[in-house]
């Protein structure tokens, strides 16, 4: 039990304090990528817990049931029964919903009556628990009996400490419409105290299975993440017990025309053939009238984005290992005619929580989206968008080069902990991208090598013809001069070190002589950017010295953000945090103008 103060409420449940409730609140992922196999931190732990359960029950093909008979549950005698399989059946009518338990202590519930009540009060609740933090009548799950063609189901929250849907609290006295695959949590804690279920709409599942969905072969369990037009659920292969991430793409929400549906399937067919040690693999594909299902390799390390927020910045050797993997996987895609076009830390996954072994996801499907959907996805994370995406009206006008721009931005963030173009909320943010207006402010970049700065300057280049290709990036001295150290990282993670890259001839040899040279020759933002070239570096150095004292306050603010970086932050608050850090660049630009 948590050491925080508790109090007993009128209904007999133990009420947690506001501080404790905040600690219980799991992370909410604001946006998911179109083919990501990532999990939220809460989803990772759930997947890990369930993995142990699955291994113990591989001989039992009914993976969505738990056979533990020592359940801390009692049922009312008149409307429920327990079957030998470990399933609790409530009611005697048509099976319309299931609650698949995510904790082996509790069984799966089959709902055969219009409503059930969960809580602690025996004789009142259909499904009871003994935990003191559960209310007498905690929540009610019910469907609208007047709708016959489909299920319209709700959860009423009648609890003191909260009922949660996909890690979001409903609120006492409120109700919410639930959909197939929602996670309903009575106690959202991790581990043995967790009381959570996946709601399975039996009508929807049966319909999808009859149309060729994966339900015949896989048990679809908890939601690992949701987004604008897709969700990811943990899938357990019934025959083997192996776990996968099943990406469910809603074709209607993706605004699929007939032509684009064909394009989507063409892209998927190409992606199923992609095989690379740093790219999420697609095991198989299912399609129904409503959804496209991608069965993906499951990784448990979360997103690189979360690692950036927690670690703030990385040593150059670590960055080099991360970028070497990223660039090698992008080179593989480009050599096979595939442009990722949405590279960002949210789409770069970690194979395990304690390593930097990368797995990139969400590649190749952007061409199947309509223009509005694609731009909506891009604008959700504008820090990584190449200028040609903002200036060209048709996506056919750009391709592989946008990946190199994104790699440059990612490299910048990994090395210093904040993005190059400032806060996206500022009015001139997109103009900075279009004009390549960024800098290497002191003191944050003082200890970072000129080689790293040179690579970034050749990647974040507005002129596409002058921007590095992926082969040129891999042949840059920042990589080639430090291969022995990078190989040690590869050996530690048991990865095959990539072969040498073939250099392109049409782009200039990288210049590593000065970190203070003009960043973007074609820049239109001279009033924001340094008005210096290699011939007046002394002037530039004086400006940097003047800025050092002024930047102390910014450093203190950044440290305060570090101290407040808790594990319970939501995805949106983490993005706001990264935006706050980006003000370092905004303040630096203003100071340069004054100087």
From Swiss-Prot:
Keyword list, A-Z: ATP-binding, Kinase, Nucleotide-binding, Phosphoprotein, Serine/threonine-protein kinase, Transferase
Annotated ATP binding sites: 224-232, 247
GO function terms (MF aspect): ATP binding; protein serine kinase activity; protein serine/threonine kinase activity
UniProt keyword Protein transport present: no
Pfam families xrefs: FHA, Pkinase
FHA domain segment(s): 116-170
Biased composition range(s): Low complexity: 18-31, 50-70, 530-567
CC per GO annotation: nucleus
Annotated positions of the Phosphothreonine modification: 377
InterPro entries: FHA_dom, Kinase-like_dom_sf, Prot_kinase_dom, Protein_kinase_ATP_BS, Ser/Thr_kinase_AS, SMAD_FHA_dom_sf
Ranges of Basic and acidic residues composition bias in the record: 585-595
Catalytic reaction(s) noted: L-seryl-[protein] + ATP = O-phospho-L-seryl-[protein] + ADP + H(+); L-threonyl-[protein] + ATP = O-phospho-L-threonyl-[protein] + ADP + H(+)
Enzyme class: transferase
Compositionally biased tracts (Polar residues): 32-49, 508-520
Protein kinase domain mapped to chain residues: 218-479
Keyword tRNA-binding belongs to the record: no
EC numbers for this chain: 2.7.11.1
GO aspect biological process, one term: DNA damage response
Residue numbers spanned by region Disordered: 1-84, 494-595
Active site per database record: 342 (proton acceptor)
Superkingdom: Eukaryota
PANTHER family, per database record: SERINE/THREONINE-PROTEIN KINASE (PTHR24347)
Family: Belongs to the protein kinase superfamily. CAMK Ser/Thr protein kinase family. CHK2 subfamily.
Name by which UniProt lists this protein: Probable serine/threonine-protein kinase fhkC
Organism annotation: Dictyostelium discoideum (Social amoeba)
Gene that encodes it: fhkC
